[in-house]
Amino acid sequence: PMMLTELVSAADRVGATSSRLAKIDALAELLSRADPTEIPAVVGLLLAAPRQGRLGVGWRGISALDIAHADSPALTVGEVDQALDALA
């Protein structure tokens, strides 16, 4: 399964360059590593348009949650997608 940190890293690389070819390379590399079943979730998260549609949850609601931070990155794209399913 694809780790969320992989998606974030690719998004950071895309945002950090003005080179269209570098953007394409970063996205192509990311999508080539994704399982075919993860592609809709990956694309939705990259576009800030999750496949679940508008959730009506903003930064204020998320920041109010009392959740401990993980010692190391552990979330997968699939787990984030499932959590968004539960909110939808």
Task: State each model region's role.
Residues P1-A88:
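N-terminal nucleic-acid-engaging modules of covalent nucleotidyltransferase systems
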